[in-house]
């Protein structure tokens, strides 16, 4: 299969049709899930799909080294390429590498100001303007405020990109709303356009749409995360 066919047949095209226009530049999306459901894998799947569509991606992690994040991309790309018998694999891989930047911040060194300055530097000196910005491990939902989410949304507007965040749902101790969303997330929801949940169902993980911008009708998304390959698949 060539890259164009892969893009057309990607399960994430179904996700985009479920949310007319997708997340959209200048907006924040959040994926929720318990430990082990694949929140980071989902972010990487989103990133890889964007890269295969010639979009530049900035992946920021506060809980893993750059080598570890890169290894994760490599593993998922390899599994995807083998699953679809991807043509011209080396050339496509090189394109993915050129269009992706990974920044990691450890020991609580991350601030929005630092990533803003880094993004501006990349734009001015490296001709790198991400269409998608992925945050793995940020913010700390136990401590974050609506003002901090507003600042993240402002960053999405400044960079004219989509921003995806992840949030862990604790098995015990989390206060939840009627949808099962932790209240520590809902207190910032005015700044969140799309909410997704990775729901563990026996031997598979189902993707569930909880919020679609301001739409009162939320579509059923027929996509799962394969726990073996960490790839998105048709349900």
Regions found by a protein language model. Give the residues of each.
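Pre-Walker A adenine-sensing motif
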Residues: 8-22
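Short hydrophobic/aromatic beta-strand immediately N-terminal to the Walker A/P-loop
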Residues: 29-32
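The conserved Walker
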Residues: 35-36
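Conserved P-loop
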Residues: 40-107
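Structural recognition of the conserved hydrophobic beta-strand(s) that form the central parallel beta-sheet
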Residues: 59, 132-136, 161-171
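Conserved nucleotide-binding/hydrolysis micro-motifs of P-loop NTPases
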Residues: 63-67, 75, 107-111, 139-141, ...
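Phosphate-binding/switch loop-helix module in NTP-utilizing enzymes
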Residues: 100-159
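Phosphate-binding/switch region of NTP-binding enzymes
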Residues: 167-235
